[in-house]
Amino acid sequence: MQHARQHRGRRVRRVGTPLSSIQHIKQGPSEEAKRQHIKRLRMKKQRAQHAQRSHRPRTNSPRTSGKSPKNSLRIQKPIRDRWAAIAEETQRIVLGDGQYVEERIVPAVSSAVAQSYTQGSSFVDPLISSLKALQMQPAHIAHNIFSQIQLSRQGTIFFPHYSDSLANWATAQKRALPTLSQTNIKFVHDSTLLAARQLAQSMSSNTSRIGVLSFASPKKPGGGFLHGGDEQEETIARLSSLVASLTSPAAQDFYKEHKKHWSEDGSGLHDHSMLYSPGVVVFRADGDDEEINLGDPVGGAFISPYQIDVVSAVPVNAAAVRAKHIILPSERQFFEDGIRGAMKERMARILRVFEEKGDKVLVLGAFGCGSSQNDVEVIASLWAELLSF
């Protein structure tokens, strides 16, 4: 993005994230008074909205309807403390020896069933006896994912903001891929990792790998996952080996580039750099995975490991862009078009990375529609446009 600033009586242009749609607009004295008035009204409205949001329970936290705000916060704190404890244990496993024990509940049949087949004094229906004698018992299964974690960490690839292979996504010669009979697009109201696990269960070992988009923090690996955060990337980091990749040497370049662009631009558009983490191991269940968690909304139960390929990219922080600029009603569409243009470029590069790496089964999601406040209809339309490109 290019924008102009007043500096010692002259106009200076600073180059940041390339987006021409959002620029400062030259203002006259009468316009300035109008802008300041609108800004005061908007700030008052934002403060009211922020106060309302601070007392609103999170959608993927346990339901707290009918509770007072204070009671809701008291309910959520233990949940977040448990998420933080799970995240710390996950990090110890991932950055340690990679070993954990899965507890799986399996059916067990008592010896009475076997005896019924050998007793000849009276007839015993084997099916009825089996159902009566059926019990459930825990089975403990040890897993060692150390080697796969190291492969994922070593295979992590950094794609810089000025990546020629990604910047030319619209005109690049596409690699020859096997012709598919059809492309299936499915909309589900599930978490990212629940959708990924269901795909992993339905796919045979010789089919395509699963690509997952992670809505990355521009500042630190996994965002606030160690503090009980439950944003999308934080959840993935809490339940998988992603943190090993995000702390790799390649990832350090990713965070350095974001810091550099933020210091140059600072508008919330962020840059187009991204990470590709192959073979990330998922070994814990998400909170909405009722098959595993049996109604516990916290999640985190150990499961049999499966692998996903993760692209970590930072969405445009639309909320920050709107807050940074004084936007008149007549200018609103101008700014929204700029945000849309930046998101389209970033999302196209994400798909290009998956295409280059051969990931044909993707879990994408509402990229940047949480705290970044991108419009969900805009993001859906962009995915539709790019997937049919």
Q: Which residues are covered by each model-predicted region?
A:
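Macrodomain-like recognition of ADP-ribose-binding/processing modules
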Residues: 2-362, 366-389
